[in-house]
Amino acid sequence: MSRLLSFFFVALSALSLPFAPPALAQTTEALSTADYSTAAFNQLICQRLDSLVRLPLMERSQLGLCVYDLTTDSLLYAHGQQQRMRPASSMKVITAVTALEKLGGDYQFTTQLYSTVAPSDSVLQGSLVARGGFDPLFGRDDLRAFVDALQQRGIRRIQGDLLLDLSQKDTTSFGWGWCWDDKNKPLTPLLYRGNDSWADHFLEQLLRAGITLEGTIRRSTLPKGAILLAERKHSIDQVLRPMLKDSNNQCAEAVFYQLAALSKRPYATHKDAAAVVHRLISRCGLQPSHYTVADGSGLSLYNYVTPQLLVAMLRHAANNEEIFTHLTTALPIMGRDGTLKSRCRRTTAQDNVRAKTGTLEGVSSLTGYAMAANGHRLCFAIINQGVRTTAEGRNFQDAVCRALTQGFDTPHIRPDVQPDVAPSSEEEQNTPSLLEDTP
């Protein structure tokens, strides 16, 4: 753990983030500021959290809270940590950790273009095959590269069809348990700028390049002996960043279905992906049957996890340097970027917390890592369920983050007098905020 902790400081120093404990001043606390022993400091944090869980908000809503000290490898605080609750977009942490564990940090999302026969002069007497790899970042430059590959081979006319291989996942367009009135993009392995209009845009680019398609567009699977003409790739880091920083739902589902594809079965389903997550849950020492994994983004109302599970995933990541590096790089930084950009500014939590937010109707969550003032690295999960407004949950979560990062000398501020709440436009909504290419 010491090597990982050293890495954590080095990485943050490279980003010029003030992650060191704040300077100590004369204390107003009962405990001495000179006593930064683990026991004394943990007592102070627990006292702060005890005061928060007794707030009136907890009388009209449900709370799940779990804080783990990674430095001492011990549970620091728990309140309702085994309650099954909807995680909202904190589900993306589970998806990300599982993907980094099973796919690796070098994994790439790949979209390929094939021909069924070798080109002859300027005529392709066979068909083109576009094989989707569920790349949510496939855009204009990628599509242009496919057309360029045809032009470089001198192809001016395609006598066959344009075949779309969408066999990486099943034919359902939306996630299991998604609300019918959510405005979410369809889930398909062949995407163009986050939309399912890949074929239309490809045909448009062919016409602009003076290439004629004589056949039709239809679905198929990749024929044996097909010839690879071009492929475009995006790294898992490129996908994880918008998935976690901006809470991009489509990126999360794309990652989820890469896990499903590990089944090696055509038309894999969400159940195939969930089975991969379940295996990691078992490795973390928990019982998969106690949870419901319905999707990768947290949009589904069928997802049920616990703060204990979320913390177990964070602990697993912290114990695996490669996973930890990729994960923490993609998580929002409190008060700096992503969905945490406007939260806890000018407080001890700013720069000292990296966490994933979550918001659904009646649910608000926050899951991630914090650096305590005594130099201990913590991980935590907070789920507020049954909250009337998003602000209620976020105010509470921000107060917890301040409680975890304040020193002995910092007055504890209750959430009912702390206005540090990001505008709802800064937070993820049920509609994914898809990345757009520049013209």
Show which residues each predicted segment covers.
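A small/polar active-site loop signature that marks catalytic segments
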Residues: Y192-T328
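Active-site SXXK
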Residues: D73, P87-D106, L162, H201-L203, ...
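Beta-lactamase-like hydrolase cores
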Residues: P21-T71, Y77-R84, D148-R153
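Soluble periplasmic/extracytoplasmic beta-strand elements of cell-envelope proteins
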Residues: G64-Y68, L76-A78, T95, S127-R131, ...
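Bacterial Sec-dependent N-terminal signal peptides
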Residues: M1-S32, Y36, P439
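Active-site-adjacent, His/Asp/Glu-enriched structural segments that form or flank metal-binding
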Residues: Q108-K169, W178-K185
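C-terminal soluble interaction/assembly domains
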Residues: T292, S300-P439
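Extracytoplasmic
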Residues: R60-Q62, G80-Q82, A88-M91, D106-Q108, ...
